[in-house]
């Protein structure tokens, strides 16, 4: 298994390009199953999860063409197997996203129950209940969700008990080809949901209210092809900005957007960062100062994102003062804390709150990544620590960050990959 070797205590300095958002690319790739003409998706990040989704479509008989710029052209009409098999789904929860589109376009779907990161309970029952409300017959047996519909799905009024991003996306996609009008209430408002809706609209869907908690979809008879570029990754953007703040550096990130990152930029401002922005770039400059500790509470968008929580815990470990970080979205999401403690961090856990008392510096140590964002926090900790840090199990990082060591090297970090 690959590891990352990081030499610390050097401010990050320089400029990097931000990749396309994985959490936008995955549902959009699934949405190509709805079209009866080729769809071309650009700005896809080079990530394992994207490769898995492309492999999943290919395994189902869908014809795909990929160019050197990671643009993918998808011909869904060539589909031969309406099954998403366990061996692919188990490595990536987002495979559940093919359920709605397959059912809506082809009248049946069989999808293995998902795998992915080990963060708390993420039930798929809201997806199932929503599709049943639209007239689907669904059976869960032998570890598979087996769904069928006679004719077309029917528009329905669906209230989501809890805000779920993939649940909203699955039902949004299914509703585009349903008979009549579907209303999704308590819908997720994330930028990635908006991006998916914009792509569906480019394919001919009739959608209103995306970005609010009530989405209205008027079903259409068919969706056509389009070309669409995935939006920039706000979590990757935030991760590099926090790394710059923690190391007292100065970093400019390009090909990104400030409007999808407001809650994070607010907290970095509170930490003492000088932030400037342009049409497609954000620059953060600490002017050599130590960051100030910040307190925050995670919640669904537009509040502070749970996917940035671990990175702020890492920054707080070397900040001036004490910060309380409350996690309200996922249980079991402080697995990075015990690893940070091995590096000398002073962190007290009280239920779903991490109280972080900043120390002058951390000490490099061997640590282990437990999930995608926790691993990013360990990289940040390694960058600020004295001595060398060895991060094990970095396949978690590779699921969400494109070429993290190469981008960090461009910013002057001492970091290299050690092949397993």
Curated annotation (Swiss-Prot):
Pathway(s) per entry: Cell wall biogenesis; peptidoglycan biosynthesis
InterPro entries: Enolpyruvate_Tfrase_dom, Enolpyruvate_Tfrase_sf, MurA_subfamily, RNA3'P_cycl/enolpyr_Trfase_a/b, UDP_GlcNAc_COvinyl_MurA
A GO CC annotation given for this chain: cytoplasm
Entry binding sites for UDP-N-acetyl-alpha-D-glucosamine: 93, 122-126, 307, 329
Cytoplasm as UniProt keyword: yes
Catalytic residues in the record: 117
GO annotation, biological process: cell division; cell wall organization; peptidoglycan biosynthetic process; regulation of cell shape; UDP-N-acetylgalactosamine biosynthetic process
GO MF assignments: UDP-N-acetylglucosamine 1-carboxyvinyltransferase activity
Annotated compartments: Cytoplasm
Broad enzyme group: transferase
Pfam family, one: EPSP_synthase
EC number: 2.5.1.7
2-(S-cysteinyl)pyruvic acid O-phosphothioketal: residues carrying this PTM: 117
Keyword terms of this UniProt record: Cell cycle, Cell division, Cell shape, Cell wall biogenesis/degradation, Cytoplasm, Peptidoglycan synthesis, Pyruvate, Transferase
Chain positions recorded as phosphoenolpyruvate binding sites: 22-23
Catalysis: reaction(s): phosphoenolpyruvate + UDP-N-acetyl-alpha-D-glucosamine = UDP-N-acetyl-3-O-(1-carboxyvinyl)-alpha-D-glucosamine + phosphate
PANTHER family in the record: UDP-N-ACETYLGLUCOSAMINE 1-CARBOXYVINYLTRANSFERASE
Protein role: Cell wall formation. Adds enolpyruvyl to UDP-N-acetylglucosamine.
Protein family (similarity comment): Belongs to the EPSP synthase family. MurA subfamily.
Protein's recorded name: UDP-N-acetylglucosamine 1-carboxyvinyltransferase
Organism: Hahella chejuensis (strain KCTC 2396)
Lineage: Bacteria, Pseudomonadati, Pseudomonadota, Gammaproteobacteria, Oceanospirillales
Name of encoding gene: murA
